[in-house]
Amino acid sequence: KEKGPSHQINMEDIPGPNECVSELEIKKKMIDKVPAKYRDFFLREKPIEMRHLPGESMFDEPKNKLPYKHVWMKAVGKLPDDALQHQAILAYASDMGLLSTSMNPHKLSFAKGNVMSASLDHAMWFHRPFRADEWMLYSTDSPSASNARGFNRGSVYTEKGVLVASA
């Protein structure tokens, strides 16, 4: 740590995690669209709980034509007090759902089956201490898509609005 000036871009005023729908609930509502042999895999519990704003899940038909998304996320269960472990978990979690942000303006969706995607690279900057087992807001945007590539970036905030990481 070094002393010096400090600032951050403020977190948007959006509904909190208790006002959002869990990814598991979204999946349960669409389970009839999933072939029977894949249903257990589709509904399996993940190590990261995610809660999406209405219409912003990667499984939803994009209603928002702007290249922005927001998701609340946290690790399932209590984690040890090891900052590196929390950073590793956030780095893992921050790659989930990031790609779908650049699809919004084009009405593309994983649910439609008309998308093939992969992360070409992924970088993280950790600004302030945080706990990955507490709710964090992941606000993503996509300033550009061209040549079959979508550029996405994100900001991670604590529930109190402290910017803790950027991707």
Regions found by a protein language model. Give the residues of each.
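Terminal targeting signals and extreme-terminal segments of soluble enzymes
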Residues: 1-167
